[in-house]
Regions:
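Surface-exposed loop/turn and secondary-structure junction residues enriched for glycine/proline
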Residues: 24, 57-58, 97-98, 135, ...
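Sec-dependent N-terminal signal peptides of Gram-positive bacterial secreted proteins and lipoproteins
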Residues: 1-28
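Hydrophobic pocket-lining residues within nucleotide cofactor-binding pockets
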Residues: 16, 94, 132
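Sequence-level motif detector for i,i+2 pairs with an aromatic at +2
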Residues: 24, 41-43, 49, 84, ...
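Compositionally biased intrinsically disordered regions enriched in Thr/Gly
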Residues: 4-5, 108-309
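Beta-loop motif signature
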Residues: 28-110
Length: 309
């Protein structure tokens, strides 16, 4: 039987306060295309080459809405073949395809840099997982989705095994509470063609308390590859700076009531430690019993990029 224990609601709540599942304010991606910022939902732009009109559609007819002059540029959010070709520049307002305008489709990598679509899927109420769409690299998109589906299937399999074990334990007079294995996720970073997913797990199979842990997955969507912490902290100088930053942060948190065993912290493990991207750098996660008692829970240390660059 797998070594699962019950997660205390209080401790897990404290742990998640510092985890990727805690409410976060993530800055919107800023993507510049030429001299104009690309925005969510934009598919292209039209440049006015000669003075012309923008149009509305009324009673299935094009009606001039306002005049536009040479040099003006408008974001395009939709494209239609009606009336010889229309480009939606705002709600109900269109530029008509003609020699008076030039249409340019936004580069796919620029659109992807604004953030891909992540959809929540569930195998059961206790197991949810992410599926992505909108990636340029479709084989990679399919591979990504299979990976997280398989992770979810394994979690649900473990849950089902625990429920069977619970039945056996109850027959033998031992089952202090419902056994379970839960999985959910958050997306702490989704911009600049980087996607970070944090999978939060907890499990209980009897005992005083259970286990909670976070697995993170970070991807370079343009290169279609997973990013490791070693890719970011790639030399001893950077590693020493990050270690010093975390050590000082532990000391500061201890003054506010945390119980980090600062002397036991020697270094970040760039091969195994979990991390995710933030708008200002990265965040490194330490699990239960890492550098502190169980009551410390799961802790996240946000490292500004200025520390390791």
């Amino acid at each position: 039987m797998k070594r699962f224990k019950r997660v205390s609601a209080v401790v897990l709540g404290f742990a998640l306060l510092f985890s990727p599942l805690a409410p976060q304010t993530v800055a919107e991606a800023k993507v510049v295309w030429g001299n104009q910022e690309l925005v969510k939902g934009q598919i292209g732009r039209v440049t006015v080459l000669k003075n012309t009109n923008l149009y509305n559609i009324k009673n299935n007819k094009l009606v001039a809405a306002r005049k536009v002059t040479k040099g003006q540029v408008f974001r395009v959010y939709s494209e239609s073949s009606k009336f010889g070709g229309l480009y939606g520049v705002s709600k109900g307002t269109y530029a008509q395809k003609s020699s008076s305008i030039k249409y340019e489709k936004a580069p796919r990598d620029k659109i992807q840099a604004l953030g891909v679509t992540v959809t929540k899927k569930s195998l059961a109420s206790n197991t949810s997982y992410p599926q992505v769409s909108g990636l340029i690299n479709k084989p990679f998109e399919a591979s990504y989705n299979r990976k997280f589906l398989n992770i979810a299937k394994e979690a649900q399999k473990e849950h089902n095994e625990l429920k069977e074990q619970e039945k056996e334990d109850r027959k033998n007079g031992w089952a202090p509470g419902p056994y379970s294995r839960n999985m959910t996720y958050s997306v702490p970073y989704n911009q600049d063609n980087i996607l970070s997913v944090a999978v939060t797990n907890d499990a209980y199979a009897g005992g005083v308390h259970g286990n909670a842990w976070i697995d993170t997955y970070n991807y370079d969507l343009l290169k279609a590859r997973q990013i490791s912490l070693k890719d970011i902290i790639n030399n001893n100088t950077k590693l020493n700076k990050v270690n010093n930053y975390i050590r000082n942060e532990m000391i500061a948190r201890n003054k506010k009531g945390a119980q980090f065993w600062v002397n036991e912290f020697k270094s970040v493990n760039v091969k195994d430690d979990q991390f995710y991207y933030t708008s200002s750098g990265i965040a490194i996660i330490f699990g239960e019993y890492e550098y502190g008692p169980y009551s410390n829970g799961i802790h996240t240390f946000k490292i500004p990029s200025s520390v390791y660059k």
